Structure formats: C-alpha cells, structure tokens
Swiss-Prot record:
Species annotation: Hyperthermus butylicus (strain DSM 5456 / JCM 9403 / PLM1-5)
InterPro entries: Deacylase_DtdA_archaea, DtdA
Protein name listed in UniProt: D-aminoacyl-tRNA deacylase
Family: Belongs to the DtdA deacylase family.
Gene that this polypeptide is encoded by: dtdA
UniProt entry keywords in alphabetical sequence: Hydrolase, Metal-binding, Zinc
Co-factor note (free text): Binds 2 Zn(2+) ions per subunit.
Cofactor(s) of this protein: Zn(2+)
Length: 272
C-alpha cells in the first residue's frame, strides 16, 4: 500500500489533495506531525504536513508500518509549464534543497513509470498537452533519508499553474486512476538507471512512454562531474524493482567508462 503525501504550504499539493478527498471520501485520522490526515475510502492514507515536501525525511517515523512507499503531490519550480514525475536525491557534495549530500532516496521505478504514463493519458484527455510538457525529471532535492521508496508527482512551473483547477484535477485524476487500475498492471520491459541527458530527459522520458522502460535514478548531464561508482551502486541498491539496464545519453568518455565498469561488475546491460 502506498501513502499520498503533501505539504500544507504547497498550493499544488494541497489543492490536489482536496480534490482527491472530495472525489474518494474517507475518514479523518491522526498521525504524529500531520496537520491534515484522511484515511481514504480505498484504504490509502492522504497526509499533509506543515514542513515543505523536500524536508520529509521523517515519514518512516510517523506513517504506519504497512506502508510500502510514498507518492508526494507537489509543486514544481522551473522554466516552462510542465507535469512531471521524479525520484529524489542529491548526487553531489551539496544539499541546498533537503536531504543529505551524496545520498539517494529509495527509488520505485514501476510506480514512477505508471504515474508518468497515466499523467500523459489524463493530460491528453483534458487537453493540456499543447500547453504542458509531460516529462520525467532527473533525480534532485530531498528527502533522501528514507527506508521506503518515494516518488514525486508535480505541477509546474509557477504559482499560475500550481493553483489552476484543471492542473490539480489532472494530478488528482492521475493518482486516483493509478491507484484503482494501473498500480497492479504496470509493465517494465526494462528497469534502468539513466545517465546523461538534460534535467528534463527527453531520451529517458521517451523510453518510459514509448518503449515500456521503468527508471530508477536518473543522473543528468549537470551532475556527471560528481558521478562515482559509489553513487551508481547506491542507485542499484536503493531501487525497489531489480535493475537490469544502464541507459546512456550523450555522456563524456570518463562517464562512459565508469558506466561500462559498473555494468560489467553487476551484470547489467549497457545501452547507448
């Protein structure tokens, strides 16, 4: 069972949570540190905290033990209107937005892929794809110090988009549909770690939407100077589904050799 998490300070997350609560109904509940808590009619916890979502490293301490992982309803800040899904972590020496340096949160490839595919279908049905890019993001920000996997689903990129009823409806419908139908039927032709590409990784996103791939952590070109064998091993170890492939996208020779050595060490397919 997953738990739906949001920050009460976040207009995108809290607005989407309100719609989910209206559509599914449920009973009020109480959990430590939670400012809002609903046990939805489908048995899923919908929980809001005062802390910003990037600082939720305490989730394992306050959520019931039978929760398998977390889906965070969140805003996204960036350049253009987007509907995004990503894993969290700090693949480098700095952690300005939550979590710890050199630390990756547990990844949930099957859930991330299922959410992205459903998000695109819903966005198409609602007529949003002409305005919004539906995309994965590379791994970034906190929280990182969790034992169970976490996936962020987001509305971007400014307050104008965060508060729109249609974007919140799209996120809410995506999550509800995923829980009702797609959670048990997500297929992964490959489970991959992604290396290279931009922060909004076109190649890796296409692999999910068009080729049936599911992704663990994605290391964008902006963090490749920090990439080490230890980070790749951490991504491998902290992935709920078994990784079988490393996908490269326009990486320098040093990184290509590092990826090759990593893939050979763990018996993974290397795809360029």
């Amino acid at each position: 069972m997953l738990a739906l998490i949001y920050s009460a300070r976040d207009p995108a997350g809290s607005g989407t949570a309100r719609i989910i609560r209206e559509l599914l109904g449920g009973d009020r509940c109480s959990l430590p540190r939670a400012v809002e808590c609903t046990l939805l009619s489908n048995g899923v916890y919908l929980v809001g905290f005062d802390a910003d979502s990037i600082f939720l490293d305490f989730l394992g301490e306050v959520l019931p033990a039978n929760i398998e992982g977390y889906v965070v309803l969140s805003r996204h800040s960036g350049g253009k209107p987007s509907l995004t899904v990503h894993h969290t972590g700090n693949p480098g020496p700095e952690a300005p937005y939550g979590g710890k340096p050199w630390s990756l949160a547990p990844a949930w490839p099957r859930t991330a892929a299922g959410l992205l595919r459903t998000y695109r279908r819903v966005a198409e049905e609602m007529g949003l794809t002409g305005e919004f890019q539906v995309t994965l993001e590379a791994t970034h920000h906190g929280p990182t110090e969790l034992e169970k996997p976490i996936v962020f689903i987001e509305i971007g990129s400014s307050e104008r988009e965060w508060v729109r009823r249609d974007t919140q409806n799209a996120m809410a419908e995506t999550v509800i549909r995923f829980m009702e139908r797609d959670l048990v039927s997500v297929e992964c032709s490959k489970v991959a770690i992604g290396i290279g590409d931009t922060h909004y990784p076109i190649k890796h996103t296409r692999n999910v939407l068009e080729r049936g791939y599911c992704y663990s952590h994605i290391f964008s070109k902006h963090v490749l100077d920090n990439l080490t064998l230890e980070l790749l091993e951490q991504a491998l170890e902290k992935t709920r589904d078994k990784v079988d492939t490393v996908v490269l996208a326009k990486v320098p020779s040093r990184v290509k050799q590092l990826a090759r050595s990593f893939a050979e060490k763990y018996g993974l397919q290397l795809e360029k």
